[in-house]
Amino acid sequence: MAPAGSTRAKKGILERLDSGEVVVGDSGFLFTLEKRGFVKAGLWTPEAVVEHPSAVRQLHTEFLRAGADVLQTFTFSATEDNMASKWEAVNAAACDLAQEVAGGGGALVAGGICQTSLYKYHKDETRIKNIFRLQLEVFARKNVDFLIAEYFEHVEEAVWAVEVLREVGAPVAVTMCIGPEGDMHDVTPGECAVKLARAGADIIGVNCRFGPWTSLQTMKLMKEGLRDASLQAHLMVQCLGFHTPDCGKGGFVDLPEYPFGLEPRVATRWDIQKYAREAYNLGIRYIGGCCGFEPYHIRAIAEELAPERGFLPPASEKHGSWGSGLNMHTKPWIRARARREYWENLLPASGRPFCPSLSKPDA
C-alpha cells in the first residue's frame, strides 16, 4: 500500500467509477459550520463562502486531508429564491473555494444543487427548472468537474434537476433524501432509481435524512429496481453521521432532537468503517457522508477502503488503525484497547442514564 498522502492522477468521475475505483466523497457543511458559528440554523444558507471564506476553505482542506476524492461546492440552497441578489456571488465564491483547495490534492469539484422550497407549493416545472439553470450557468462558467443534484424528497423534482444539469454535458449525479418507504409521493426507492436513470443520471443514490444502516437498506432497493428494469447507473451513498433507526418517513428532521440535540446519536469512526465496508460490498463505489459527518468520519471511510484504493489519506499519519496507537499508553487497560476486536464490539454508553435509546418522531 502506498504511504499516507499519496494521490492519484486527476481522472474524471466516470472514468474512475467505470474502472471500478472507490471514490470517497466529502460531507455536509451545514451542521459542521453551524457548530463552528458560521451558518445560521433554520435558514441553512451558505453565505459563509462570502462572509467567512477562510472557514469554508478550512473545512474543504480538512475533508481533502481526510481522504475525500470529491469536494462539493458549498451551494446548498444557494438559489435565487432563497438568497435574492446574493445568489450569484455565493455560487461563484463557492466554486472558487472548492477549486482552490481541490487543486492542491488532485480532487474533483462537484457543483451542487438541491430541492427547492417552491416545489411543495407550486409544482411549476418551468419556473423550478429556471432556478436550477441559474446555478448551472455559474457552475459551467467555473468549469466544475461534474454536477450533483442532492437532497430531493420528491422524485419528480429530482428528474427535473437531472434534465437541467444534463444540458451542459458534464457527468450528473443525483441523490434523494429518502428511506426505504420511498419519496413523499410514495414512489418506491426502486421506482425512483429507474426514473432518475431514464432521465439520464450517471450516478444515483441517497444522501442525508437517514443514518448509515437505513441508507444502505434504501440503496439495496434502488439497486434492485435498476436491475429489474435492466438499467445501469453507478451508485453513491452519503448518509447522516447520526444513528436514526427511529426515524419515520421524513427522516431525522422529524425527530425531537433535530437540530440541536443530536450529539448523543453521533456515529463513531468505527461505525463508519463498517458502513463503508457494507456499502462497498453492496456494490456502491461512491461513498461519503452528509450532516453529522466530520472529517474524521471521512478518514474512516478512506482507511477502511485503503486496501481497495491502494493508499491511505494524509490524515492517517496521525491515526493508528483500529486504535493501534494506544499500544504505547502507560495504562495497561488502555493498551488493551489497541485492537480491532475491542472497537468493533464496543457498545458505547451515552452517559445519560435517564434518556431513552429511541425517540418518537413528531411527524
Swiss-Prot record:
Reaction(s) catalysed by this chain's protein: S-methyl-L-methionine + L-homocysteine = 2 L-methionine + H(+)
Keywords: Metal-binding, Methyltransferase, Phosphoprotein, Transferase, Zinc
Keyword Zinc: yes
Classification via PROSITE patterns: HCY (PS50970)
Single Gene Ontology BP annotation: methionine biosynthetic process
Entry cofactors: Zn(2+)
Domain of life: Eukaryota
Domain called Hcy-binding: residue spans: 11-305
Positions bound to Zn(2+): 208, 290-291
InterPro entries cross-referenced by the UniProt entry: Betaine-hCys_S-MeTrfase_BHMT, BHMT, HCY_dom, HCY_dom_sf
EC number(s) reported in the record: 2.1.1.10
Tissue-level expression: Expressed in fetal heart, lung, liver, kidney and eye.
Enzymatic class: transferase
Pathway where this protein functions: Amino-acid biosynthesis; L-methionine biosynthesis via de novo pathway; L-methionine from L-homocysteine (BhmT route): step 1/1
Cofactor note: Binds 1 zinc ion per subunit.
GO molecular function, one term: zinc ion binding
Residues where Phosphoserine is found: 321
Functional description taken from the UniProt entry: Involved in the regulation of homocysteine metabolism. Converts homocysteine to methionine using S-methylmethionine (SMM) as a methyl donor.
Known partners and oligomeric status: Homotetramer.
Protein name according to UniProt: S-methylmethionine--homocysteine S-methyltransferase BHMT2
Gene from which this protein is expressed: Bhmt2
